[in-house]
Amino acid sequence: MLKHINFQATEYVIVTGGNGRIKKQGYGLDFFYNNASTSIKVIPSIAFDTSYMFNDIITHDFQNISVQGDISYVIDDFEAASEKTDFSFINPEDYAEKLSEAQSKMSKRIIGIVKTEIAQFMAAKDIRAAIQSQNELAAKLNESMKHHTYVREFGLSVINV
């Protein structure tokens, strides 16, 4: 059955045919398609924000501290992101739920990486140094997250931590 679909300018669309080859891709596409032989992935190009709070970070002198913050990130490699996260588009009604699930998975991945980076950083500090190292930690997280292999592998780019 032939259908028509129009996507927003903030949505990157990848359309594949029955042979698995990409037929078209780009921002805000508008096209007719056969839903029996066409696969569509819709990846948002907007920035995402997520918060974290860890209560189980241990310092060098075995003191427990809490660390919290926010992370902003975008998808900058749409094909890599679509391979690692399900962005398949079936109909407009289910897309919002699918996008919410995808964002949740991406946020969990990034938060896991952030927790590892923070734990390693704080493990080298005593409690006094840890409490006073807020700016140093932020700078280290910004630098390490922007170049982290796993973040790049998922097609993501961290804007700010």
Where are these regions (language model features)?
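Amphipathic, interface-forming alpha-helical segments with heptad-repeat character
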Residues: N6, V13, A47-V161
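Domain-core and long-helix interface of multi-subunit machines
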Residues: M1-T50, K108, G112
